[in-house]
Each structure stands twice: as structure tokens, then as C-alpha cells.
């Protein structure tokens, strides 16, 4: 059986508005459920309307009075991301919490986004870079917003080759996944630096779920036509290995801590406190050395603005 970590205290979030990407399943569902339980209004930003509706129904059944709504978002499409940003901007409500969670893992063969980018880089990283940029005015309007970006233990194997950022020459699915999650971690830290320098009032940090039992390990490998049944059987066998896996509510705890705890720090990185950060309650996580490279971070930001077409304001203080 997967590990179950003790629950954590979450402050009253009544009156707060949260947006969670990939909220219909896995860690996104767990985060949405816990935020709703604490009183937040949660917008589930999802690609699949039917799956989103099922998630809303399930959370609503377990959290009486939960304030939930759906917003279409396909992170593999910069046009969809822009449309999501426009829709939320037209609502005019400040966003208190943004959780950049949605992801895809190790599609085979190499797949591309609508805009021609390697799919993991596009969905896991670049799409969230663009979405956060579109929502920046609403986040700044909240006064003390939080942006939590969901990285992974696999960020440790990420390597930057800006001449082969899209894996065109040699595509290694797991390496590409690690790169996308390393990039997202670097984004979280750089967003905090820019917020501090510019007085944006946004606290940006990152979290990872450890080894959580989700459908991420199934949906990605079957994206290119792999056997869904065989992948599910394989993963059920892997999940039987004792001492490694934890359930979704536990895997969501680091993100919930990062999004709500008064002790969570800007630029921080949180994960499970157990063996090799695989399971357990939330605690500061080890930041890969590559995520601390300022020159690479600066270049990644410039490349991301160019590829996404989304520019961020100057991070200098405003009058």
C-alpha cells in the first residue's frame, strides 16, 4: 500500500481565489480538493471538459459548499493559454493562488505541441511560463499572491542544451521530462527574484510530490499510441514495491504547504521529508545545483519569452 503522510494545518482560505492547472486528476486534484476544503474558491483549469466536470462533482460531494468552476486550458497551445488568460482577466478578480501543476511524462515517440515545440517542454514548462505571464496583473492585484510551480525529483537529471532544446537531434523521453521540470523550478526561483526586485508582491516557490501514485506515468507513455493496458499493468506492479510510493493526498502536501503556509519562503522548494524525498510530510527539498546557475536561468528566461511570445514587465521597482 502507498504511504499516507499526516495531514497539515491549512489556514482559512475563505474569500481567496485559486487557479490550479491539471486539476482533474493526480496532484492537481489533490491540491484543488484541499484548497476547497480550506474555503478557497478554486478554478480547475483543465483540457478535458468531461474529466473536469467529474472532478468538480467528486470534490463537491466530499466538500459540502465547495466553490468550484472550470476553465478550459490546453497547455500544448499558446492560443488556448492566451484565451484562458483573457477569460480570467475579463472576470476581473485578483488571483491569490496559482498552482502550475499540469504535466505530461515521457511520450513516445517524440511529440510536438500545437506550436511545434517538444510536448513535455511545452506543457510542463513553457505553457506555465506563458500562463503566469498572462495572469501576472491579476496576481499582482491580489497584493500577496502565491505562485507554486510543481517540479519533480526528475529535475535532477535535467540538462540544458540550448542548441537542442526541443530534442530534435536526440530525443530521450525521461531526460526531456527532467529538463522540463528543471526549467519550471528555475522559473519559480527567477519569478521570485523579479517579484522582489520589482515590488510585485508575489511569492513564488516550487514543490515536488515525491513518488506519488498518479496517472502521469500512464498517460504520457501512451500518448503516441502505446498500450494503455500494458502500461497500467506495469505501473501496478511497480506500485507494489514497498517503501517507495505515497498516495495522492500525501503527494499534494508539499504544494499545499508552499501555497498556504505562512512559513513557506519565496524561492523555496518543498518536497516530502522521508527517505530520498520519496514520501512523507512537506519539508525543504534539495535544489539541484543546475537550478542555481544564474547565467542559464537568464538565458532560459529570454528564450522562453521569445518562444512563447509572452513578455514580462521590467523587474525594476515601480513608482
Pin down the residues of each PLM region.
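C-terminal amphipathic/interface module of NAD(P)-dependent oxidoreductases
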Residues: 288-319
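A short, mixed-charge helix-start or loop-turn motif at secondary-structure junctions
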Residues: 21, 169, 173, 237-240, ...
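C-terminal helical subdomain
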Residues: 180, 233-285, 295-298
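A short C-terminal helix-loop "cap" of Rossmann-like NAD(P)-dependent dehydrogenase/epimerase domains
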Residues: 168, 224-239
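Pocket-edge positions in alpha/beta enzyme catalytic cores
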Residues: 44, 73, 243, 289-292
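Short, contiguous pre-domain boundary segments
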Residues: 1-4, 279-290
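Alpha-helical packing segments of well-folded alpha/beta enzyme cores
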Residues: 55, 187, 251-254, 300
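Rossmann-fold NAD(P)H-dependent dehydrogenase/reductase core
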Residues: 1-225, 307-319
Amino acid at each position: 500500500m502507498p504511504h499516507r503522510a499526516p495531514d497539515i494545518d491549512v489556514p482559512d482560505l475563505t474569500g481567496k481565489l485559486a487557479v490550479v492547472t491539471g486539476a482533474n486528476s493526480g496532484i492537481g486534484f489533490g491540491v484543488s480538493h484541499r484548497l476547497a476544503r480550506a474555503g478557497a474558491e478554486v478554478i480547475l483549469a483543465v483540457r478535458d471538459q468531461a474529466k473536469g466536470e467529474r472532478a468538480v462533482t467528486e470534490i463537491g460531494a466530499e466538500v459540502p459548499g465547495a466553490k468550484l468552476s472550470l476553465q478550459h486550458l490546453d497547455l500544448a497551445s499558446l492560443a488556448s493559454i492566451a484565451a484562458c488568460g483573457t477569460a480570467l482577466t475579463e472576470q476581473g478578480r485578483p488571483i491569490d493562488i496559482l498552482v502550475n501543476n499540469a504535466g505530461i511524462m515521457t511520450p513516445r515517440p517524440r511529440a510536438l505541441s500545437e506550436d511545434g515545440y517538444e510536448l513535455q517542454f511545452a506543457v510542463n514548462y513553457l505553457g506555465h511560463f506563458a500562463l503566469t505571464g498572462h495572469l501576472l496583473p491579476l496576481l499582482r492585484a491580489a497584493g500577496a499572491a502565491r505562485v507554486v510551480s510543481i517540479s519533480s525529483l526528475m529535475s535532477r537529471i535535467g540538462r540544458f542544451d540550448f542548441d537542442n532544446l526541443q530534442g530534435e537531434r536526440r530525443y530521450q523521453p525521461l531526460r526531456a521530462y527532467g529538463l522540463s521540470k528543471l526549467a519550471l523550478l528555475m522559473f519559480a526561483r527567477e519569478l521570485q527574484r523579479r517579484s522582489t526586485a520589482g515590488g510585485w508582491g508575489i511569492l513564488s516557490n516550487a514543490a515536488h510530490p515525491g513518488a506519488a501514485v498518479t496517472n502521469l506515468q500512464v498517460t504520457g507513455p501512451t500518448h503516441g499510441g502505446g498500450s494503455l493496458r500494458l502500461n497500467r499493468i506495469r505501473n501496478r506492479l511497480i506500485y507494489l514495491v514497498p517503501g517507495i510510493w505515497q498516495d495522492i493526498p500525501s503527494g499534494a502536501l508539499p504544494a499545499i504547504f508552499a501555497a498556504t503556509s505562512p512559513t513557506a519562503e519565496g524561492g523555496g522548494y518543498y518536497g516530502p521529508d522521508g527517505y530520498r524525498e520519496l514520501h512523507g510530510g512537506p519539508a525543504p527539498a534539495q535544489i539541484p545545483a543546475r537550478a542555481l546557475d544564474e547565467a542559464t536561468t537568464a538565458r532560459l528566461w529570454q528564450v522562453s519569452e521569445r518562444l512563447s511570445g509572452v513578455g514580462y514587465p521590467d523587474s525594476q521597482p515601480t513608482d
